[in-house]
Amino acid sequence: MEARNQTAISKFLLLGLIEDPELQPVLFSLFLSMYLVTILGNLLILLAVISDSHLHTPMYFFLSNLSFLDICLSTTTIPKMLVNIQAQNRSITYSGCLTQICFVLFFAGLENCLLAAMAYDRYVAICHPLRYTVIMNPRLCGLLILLSLLTSVVNALLLSLMVLRLSFCTDLEIPLFFCELAQVIQLTCSDTLINNILIYFAACIFGGVPLSGIILSYTQITSCVLRMPSASGKHKAVSTCGSHLSIVLLFYGAGLGVYISSVVTDSPRKTAVASVMYSVFPQMVNPFIYSLRNKDMKGTLRKFIGRIPSLLWCAICFGFRFLE
């Protein structure tokens, strides 16, 4: 059937990962488990930082924000997929798709900027340890978060609102489990030159600048570590930034993997699987990277988890008293 321009559309179809109905319960259980692990892991990190005054430092301030972002980014995509699987309905409304695109761009862009701020924090901690508390003061930390928020809002609105000017064809199937900007643009019947220019411009500015900041920070860190006279000092410096560097490599490596997959393969299923590595896996793994490699975080988590039974008991007792 010939594709026709359709300026007003009501919904898109999210094809997801697997079409076999018999495998849908398995897929539902898998993604529900991954989502719960992501929420629980990042929530524990967030609550541990809030509850322990010893962790009220710039590094853990940024880490708690990263955990909150991971929760938000996962919640933007996975629950809709779970609802679609459970209801056996793969559709998403036009407004819902546009909203999902906007939030994915916002949270992913904000995480990108936050990783750059964390890299600068590690640079100051290793290269200027005596001036660390002076440089990384609460005002600067707040300004870095505010700048990241403003940058991410501009990026998300610029890229998502341009979809409003597009007309779409009759083929409205997205070969992913969530609405992704590049996939939606491929469905349009309109001229996408301006859209593609804006995408590359935004990638260079809003993506390239934070990445350049990360590379510059770690270049300075490497130079500083190599000049350290003692092996213990070098080991401490490497362990200080090891967790953050692992998350950076995972974040950008997953994004690069999705891009390479979309270029070298014509299979929508392979692209969909690669998108999982970018939109689900890093958010699930990040809490384990920081909790397993950080002694302070491990100690705080043990204390916090040990207090959970008593907190639950207090909550139950309070509930009974309230009912009385």
From Swiss-Prot:
The chain crosses the membrane at residues 26-46, 55-75, 100-120, 140-160, 198-217, 238-258, 272-292. One of its GO terms (biological process) is signal transduction. Residues 1-25, 76-99, 161-197, 259-271 are extracellular. Disulfide bonds join C97-C189. GO terms for molecular function: G protein-coupled receptor activity; olfactory receptor activity. It comes from Homo sapiens. Odorant receptor. PANTHER family: OLFACTORY RECEPTOR. Keywords: Cell membrane, Disulfide bond, G-protein coupled receptor, Glycoprotein, Membrane, Olfaction, Receptor, Sensory transduction, Transducer, Transmembrane, Transmembrane helix. PROSITE patterns: G_PROTEIN_RECEP_F1_1 (PS00237), G_PROTEIN_RECEP_F1_2 (PS50262). It holds the Pfam family 7tm_4. Belongs to the G-protein coupled receptor 1 family. Glycans are attached at N5, N89. This is Olfactory receptor 7G2. The keyword Metal-binding does not apply. InterPro entries: GPCR_Rhodpsn, GPCR_Rhodpsn_7TM, Olfact_rcpt. It is found in: Cell membrane. Residues 47-54, 121-139, 218-237, 293-324 are cytoplasmic. It is a multi-pass membrane protein. GO terms for cellular component: plasma membrane.
